């Protein structure tokens, strides 16, 4: 995975040069995917800064990016180019000044810019200058608290309009639906520059009379657009049916009927235009449309020589058209104009009350925020807009400060952000120029209220240096191969139309390959569908560059989970084959072909949250390393679920499901049989009561369950009572910390797969509790209610991240997260999953222009039905959803560099290919892809895959579960030979009584970490214990230690045990002290060392940071980013010195790494088998012990069949283009500053460890490092290990 490849060529294309040189007041650059827009934007800045005729300085620029990461990368690129220019003109004082000013330049997100403006001009508004910006989690906490308190007040007032609103929209059991409605409308209103003005204007939409003309309502134009769209769909279906009837062998008898139906629907469409002539009568039009009846098709006899398949296709197309027409009638033409307007009248008081409540709630929300001295992100933009709107002197100052405002990713801004930019760059002669770059085809943040229409409005009005502004197109694509681009262009030229997406995908915007031609040797047999199933014909086989569409037929089930599993099976099998058979792929950086790695693959999905666990399980079965990059899944994590269940029963233990879950969890450890014992012993009661009775009866010597079960229960319920008491007396965070301490749950989860992530999730859970405690009205009950609301609202915190982007794993990520990235091979899965139209299903729909679209609730008959407002907004949202999904598919397909796989499951696939849906009627991505898969399609390689569960190229359902259950149900018996049994018994007895001749070797564990070897000089010699001393006695003494750690603490003296165990606890128990239990905030030495290792492991070293640009400030920003990503904690961040890291990268080898970041491999894990006798013979102290025990060294060689398994992780392995270098970081605190002494100590301590590293690299990776170094971080000393 790499960042978007921005063209760094010295020779720019004509269009790129135009972008760099264009001087105009307003410029819009429409940059297609992979067009190198970032490089062009940087070059435009550099050209202006180094131009002696341009007075622009870097602090005269305002550069707005979408993310802080993009801002940092932009700043780094500008710094590199400035230094490059300065190296050519070292005496240029102007360039020196620009480089100095760069760190203070306004290159940031719009939020950061707004924050700076408010810090500077706070005194104009009633703002606390010491305000802080609250996290999204804190904001949600506060909003929930405010709405709860506000609704209590409303209930107390008892207004009729309020109770009518609650009865209509509050829900059956409580008022949660109304709460959600108010909060949703409040958040939605904040996307407008003047939220309250917009809310008040919405009230006017319902001020109508039955005497009014329907066409004068705000909703009519949207209704007209929706009706026209559906009419056109009908006509297209009928026309396609007509074309089918006219084919040779087609049902020509249907042609006349189809022509009549086409003509009638076209007449209906034309009549809609009459509204412009003021002669449109809704009621009469509705009657005509609703009264239209379709004729019966003429019969076709067997003697008419009609192809049966064409006849079926023709009927299917006509049926599609008829269903679309019937849907249209049902939606719009079953009620009169007066009834439609009367609905709006009825809704007026309810909507007025709802809007008033949103405004009142906002008042209270603002008041609480001011009391706390906090703002949310929305406040930053609204306050700045208020400043610019009300205080022209501020605008004038900013006009004088900035010469040009540059906006990256302009397609993703919202209305408030655009309003701010317009204030900053007005049409006055003194206002700064506005430069905007983006790609509306990649606008995929509608859920964040982004407005692609803002881009489209300028795109439609700007021209080559028109009065409104200048438009420049960047079509050249420097990322993808011509084959990938051909498939993208082919598909979107057929589905992306102005009416459906707002932009026409034509010659003006299609992607043009910019990569240079390269030699490619295709396989001899190019048409084998199973080319990845068998052995490659030669080891230099190059991956086929055609886009492949893999279709999985699903006949018997609607299970999305099963579809996902089968698609994952296909993808995992394909990836394994491509990697194991050593297919090659072109690498731009090498300008040559190389073998595929797992890290070359990404799987993109629209619904990653739902699919991650299923895909991960399948990949584990196939042995393919996979990392699912999610911002979700936190609340579903098993360890978090256990903690939530425990908190629920601490609040109220009479909850059967949470209680059973905790009892079954590792916190208690009952198995399913024990749970059944408890229930059987006390049926008819709640589970808590059943447990209490079991415990009571055990005291009275009437045991109903086993003694083992009772002991577990007694221990847990004693703890439970204690925790219930703590919950009433102490804070939530203290309660959770006590649970962690008593149960050792943090340590327990570390032993499972993904242990680091599980621990991080539990730490995050504790941190959330700390945050919650900081709010008023906190407590266990409110915390649980709050979490429940977050889950209901699909608000997820995201699992902690513990995998870096440098690891050789396949990535699974959402399409949204992949934006701006590129990958050699891309799989887009789940293409048969239906689009999410949930925003069109609620009782109240919201739209930026149309306002509110409520359903009308008939309280008397307890029914609800859609209004004209609801239907208008539903139609508009439906079109916007399809446009967004089309752009999302475009983003997914344009991530691929060399190879694109499209994978989807569906029913009746062949039928849908022959009779596809209209693009505007698509329900999923496959509906857009099916029409492109006809027999004449050469750009898409269509494949039905032979994977488990499929036969003869077509899908069949295979019930794996039933198969395994049938095996388990079988009874297997063996006849036992008594004589043979006695022989085996004697053999076993001999084995048990056997005395191992090399007992000294048992003191070396069978599996150990390489870091243990650092202690080998004080380790192996102390393992030569007396033959009379049993290992079991030592194990008993250290029974809490893992077997692999026992040798580290064995000593030759009898009284060393206790001290050694305490030493182990100090150095190996993670520091888990929360702030309220700490005497200070420091970490132990071991923890500090781990923190520094994590920093070197995860710092993003990429091609944008060379030796000149790597600064302490950048390191500081990157460390802060690791905290934000929860890779390191703030406490760990505090002990990491930027200076220490800088010292490493300023060294000769550190500089080489920055110059060639792709040559660096970090955190390489390995497992190595080493003969046990080598481990013993390698120590001088061991030799002395052998002599003392009269044991010959040759005796050790008898252990050659015994193997010690060594596990380790190599910190850095670096290839500079010629040689490999092994680097291992050490943070030992030594009580000397003498460099020779430091070198001697570290070499002696770690020599064996480094030798194992070198051996592993040579044997496993087939690489021989030229040199191996220890790097002592505290002193910056490089120590070569021979």
Curated annotation (Swiss-Prot):
Q: What is this protein called?
A: ATP-dependent helicase/nuclease subunit A
Ion transport recorded as keyword: no
List the Pfam families. PDDEXK_1, UvrD-helicase, UvrD_C
Q: Which Gene3D superfamilies match?
A: 1.10.274.50, 3.90.320.10, P-loop containing nucleotide triphosphate hydrolases (3.40.50.300), PCRA, domain 4 (1.10.486.10)
Quaternary structure and interacting proteins, as annotated = Heterodimer of AddA and AddB/RexB.
> EC number(s) per UniProt?
3.1.-.-, 5.6.2.4
Q: Which domain of life is it from?
A: Bacteria
GO terms under biological process:
double-strand break repair via homologous recombination
Question: Binding positions for ATP?
Answer: 31-38
Kindly list the GO molecular function terms attached to this UniProt entry. 3'-5' DNA helicase activity; 3'-5' exonuclease activity; ATP binding; ATP hydrolysis activity; double-stranded DNA binding
What cofactors does the UniProt entry give for this protein? Answer: Mg(2+)
Tell me which PROSITE patterns the record gives. Answer: UVRD_HELICASE_ATP_BIND, UVRD_HELICASE_CTER
Q: What does this protein do?
A: The heterodimer acts as both an ATP-dependent DNA helicase and an ATP-dependent, dual-direction single-stranded exonuclease. Recognizes the chi site generating a DNA molecule suitable for the initiation of homologous recombination. The AddA nuclease domain is required for chi fragment generation; this subunit has the helicase and 3' -> 5' nuclease activities.
- Sorted alphabetically, which InterPro entries does this protein's record hold? AddA, DNA_helicase_UvrD-like_C, DNA_helicase_UvrD/REP, P-loop_NTPase, PDDEXK-like_dom_sf, PDDEXK_AddAB-type, Restrct_endonuc-II-like, UvrD-like_ATP-bd
Keywords of the record = ATP-binding, DNA damage, DNA repair, DNA-binding, Exonuclease, Helicase, Hydrolase, Isomerase, Nuclease, Nucleotide-binding
Report the HAMAP family cross-referenced here: AddA
Q: Say which family it is in.
A: Belongs to the helicase family. AddA subfamily.
Q: Where is the UvrD-like helicase ATP-binding domain?
A: 10-481
Reaction(s) this enzyme catalyzes, per UniProt: Couples ATP hydrolysis with the unwinding of duplex DNA by translocating in the 3'-5' direction; ATP + H2O = ADP + phosphate + H(+)
Q: Give the gene symbol.
A: addA
An annotated GO cellular component of this protein is: cytosol
| TM regions (residue ranges) | none
UvrD-like helicase C-terminal domain residues: 516-820
């Amino acid at each position: 995975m790499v960042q978007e490849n921005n063209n760094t060529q010295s020779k720019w294309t004509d269009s790129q040069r135009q972008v760099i040189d264009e001087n105009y007041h307003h410029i819009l650059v429409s940059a297609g995917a992979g067009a190198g827009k970032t490089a062009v934007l940087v070059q435009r800045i550099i050209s202006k800064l180094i131009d002696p005729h341009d007075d622009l300085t870097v602090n005269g620029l305002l550069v707005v990016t979408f993310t802080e990461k993009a801002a940092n990368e932009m700043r780094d690129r500008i710094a590199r180019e400035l230094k490059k220019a300065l190296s050519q003109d070292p005496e240029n004082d102007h360039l020196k000044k620009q480089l100095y000013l760069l760190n203070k330049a306004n290159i940031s997100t719009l939020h950061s810019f707004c924050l700076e403006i408010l810090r500077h001009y706070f005194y104009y508004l009633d703002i606390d200058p010491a305000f802080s910006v609250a996290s999204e989690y804190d904001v949600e906490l506060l909003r929930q608290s405010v709405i709860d308190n506000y609704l209590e007040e409303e209930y107390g007032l008892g207004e009729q309009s309020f109770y009518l609103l609650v009865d209509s929209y509050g829900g059956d059991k409580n008022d949660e639906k109304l709460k959600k409605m108010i909060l949703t409308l409040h958040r939605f209103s904040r996307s407008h520059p003047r939220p309250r003005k917009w809310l008040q204007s919405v009230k006017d939409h319902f001020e109508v009379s039955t005497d009014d003309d329907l066409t004068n309502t705000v909703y009519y134009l949207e209704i007209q657009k929706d009706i026209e769209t559906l009419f056109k769909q009908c006509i297209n279906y009928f026309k396609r049916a007509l074309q089918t009837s006219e084919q040779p062998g087609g049902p020509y008898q249907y042609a006349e009927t189809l022509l009549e139906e086409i003509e009638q629907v076209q007449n209906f469409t034309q009549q809609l235009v009459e509204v412009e002539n003021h002669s449109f009568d809704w009621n009469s039009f509705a009657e005509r449309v609703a009264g239209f009846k379709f004729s019966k098709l003429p019969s076709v006899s067997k003697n008419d020589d009609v192809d049966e398949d064409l006849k079926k296709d023709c009927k299917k197309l006509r049926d599609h058209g008829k269903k679309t027409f019937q849907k249209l009638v049902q939606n719009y033409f079953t009620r009169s104009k007066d009834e439609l307007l009367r609905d709006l009248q009825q809704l007026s008081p309810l909507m007025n009350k709802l809007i008033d409540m949103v405004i009142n709630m906002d008042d209270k929300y603002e008041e609480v925020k001011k009391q706390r001295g906090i703002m949310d992100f929305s406040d930053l933009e609204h306050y700045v807009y208020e400043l610019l709107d009300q205080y022209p002197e501020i605008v004038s100052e900013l006009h004088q400060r900035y010469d040009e405002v540059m906006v990256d990713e302009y397609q993703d801004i919202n209305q408030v952000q655009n309003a701010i930019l317009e204030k900053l760059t007005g049409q006055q002669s003194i206002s700064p120029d506005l430069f905007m770059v983006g790609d509306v085809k990649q606008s995929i943040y509608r859920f964040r209220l982004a407005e692609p229409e803002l881009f489209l409005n300028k795109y439609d009005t700007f021209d080559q240096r028109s009065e409104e502004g200048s438009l420049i197109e960047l079509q050249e694509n420097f990322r993808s191969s011509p084959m990938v681009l051909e498939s993208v262009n082919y598909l979107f030229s057929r589905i992306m139309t102005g009416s459906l997406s707002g932009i026409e995908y034509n010659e003006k915007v299609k992607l043009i390959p910019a990569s240079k031609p390269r030699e490619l040797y295709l396989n001899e047999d190019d048409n084998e569908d199973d080319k990845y199933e068998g052995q490659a014909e030669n080891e230099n086989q190059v991956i086929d560059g055609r886009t492949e569409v893999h279709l999985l037929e699903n006949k018997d089930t609607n299970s999305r989970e099963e579809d996902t599993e089968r698609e994952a099976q296909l993808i995992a099998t394909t990836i394994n084959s491509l990697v194991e058979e050593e297919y090659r792929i072109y690498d731009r950086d090498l300008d040559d072909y190389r073998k595929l790695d797992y890290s070359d693959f990404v799987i993109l999905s629209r619904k990653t949250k739902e699919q991650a666990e299923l895909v991960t399980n399948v990949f584990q079965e196939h042995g393919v390393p996979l990392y699912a990059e999610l911002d979700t899944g936190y609340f579903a994590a098993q360890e978090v679920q256990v903690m939530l269940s425990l908190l629920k029963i601490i609040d109220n233990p009479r909850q059967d499901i949470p209680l059973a879950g905790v009892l079954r969890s590792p916190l208690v450890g009952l198995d399913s049989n024990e749970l059944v014992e408890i229930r059987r012993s006390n049926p008819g009661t709640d589970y808590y009561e059943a447990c209490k009775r079991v415990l009571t009866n055990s005291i009275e010597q009437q045991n109903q369950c086993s003694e083992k079960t009772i002991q577990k229960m007694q221990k847990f319920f004693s703890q439970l009572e204690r925790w219930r008491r703590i919950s009433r007396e102490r804070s939530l965070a203290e309660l959770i910390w006590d649970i962690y301490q008593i149960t050792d749950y943090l340590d327990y989860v570390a032993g499972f797969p993904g242990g680091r992530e599980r621990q991080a999730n539990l730490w995050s859970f504790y941190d959330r509790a700390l945050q919650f405690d900081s709010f008023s009205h906190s407590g266990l009950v409110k915390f649980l209610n709050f979490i429940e609301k977050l889950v209901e609202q699909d608000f997820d915190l995201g699992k902690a991240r513990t995998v870096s982007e440098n690891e050789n794993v396949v990535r699974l990520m959402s399409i949204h997260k992949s934006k701006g990235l590129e990958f050699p091979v891309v799989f887009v899965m789940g293409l048969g999953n239906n689009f999410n139209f949930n925003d069109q299903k609620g009782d109240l729909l919201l739209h930026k222009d149309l306002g509110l679209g409520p359903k009308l609730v008939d309280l008397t008959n307890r029914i609800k039905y859609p209004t004209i407002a609801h239907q208008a907004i539903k139609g508009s949202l439906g079109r916007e959803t399809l446009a967004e999904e089309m752009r999302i598919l475009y983003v997914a397909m344009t991530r691929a560099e060399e190879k694109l796989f499209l994978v989807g499951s569906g029913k009746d696939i062949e039928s849908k290919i022959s009779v596809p849906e209209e693009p505007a009627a698509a329900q999923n991505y496959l509906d857009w892809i099916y029409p492109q898969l006809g027999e004449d399609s050469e750009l898409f390689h269509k494949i039905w895959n032979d994977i488990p569960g499929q036969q003869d190229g077509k899908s069949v359902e295979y019930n794996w579960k039933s198969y395994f259950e049938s095996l388990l149900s079988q009874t297997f018996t063996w006849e036992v030979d008594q004589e043979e049994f006695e022989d085996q018994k004697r053999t076993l007895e001999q084995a048990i009584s056997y005395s191992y001749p090399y007992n000294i070797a048992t003191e070396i564990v069978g599996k150990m970490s390489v870091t243990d070897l650092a202690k080998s000089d004080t380790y192996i010699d102390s393992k030569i214990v007396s033959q009379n001393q049993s290992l079991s006695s030592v194990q008993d003494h250290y029974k809490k230690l893992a077997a692999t750690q026992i040798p580290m603490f064995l000593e030759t003296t009898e009284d060393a045990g206790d001290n050694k165990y305490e030493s182990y606890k100090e150095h190996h128990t993670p520091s888990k002290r929360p702030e309220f239990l700490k005497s200070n905030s420091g970490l132990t030495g071991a923890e500090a060392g781990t923190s520094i290792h994590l920093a070197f492991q995860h710092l993003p070293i990429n091609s944008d940071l060379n030796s000149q640009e790597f600064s302490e400030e950048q390191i500081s920003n990157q460390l802060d980013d690791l905290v934000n990503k929860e890779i390191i904690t703030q406490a760990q961040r505090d002990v990491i010195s930027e200076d220490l890291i800088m010292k490493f990268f300023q060294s000769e080898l550190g500089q080489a790494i920055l110059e060639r970041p792709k040559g660096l491999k970090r955190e390489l894990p390995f497992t190595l088998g080493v003969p046990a006798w080598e481990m013993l013979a390698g120590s001088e102290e061991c030799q002395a012990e052998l002599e003392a025990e009269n044991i010959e060294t040759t005796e050790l060689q008898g252990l050659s069949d015994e193997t010690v398994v060594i596990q380790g992780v190599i910190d850095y392995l670096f290839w500079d283009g010629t040689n490999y270098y092994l680097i291992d970081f050490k943070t030992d605190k030594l009580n000397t500053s003498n460099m020779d002494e430091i070198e001697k100590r570290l070499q002696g301590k770690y020599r064996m460890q480094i030798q194992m590293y070198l051996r592993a690299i040579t044997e496993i990776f087939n690489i021989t490092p030229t040199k191996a170094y220890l790097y002592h971080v505290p002193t910056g000393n490089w120590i070569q290990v021979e």
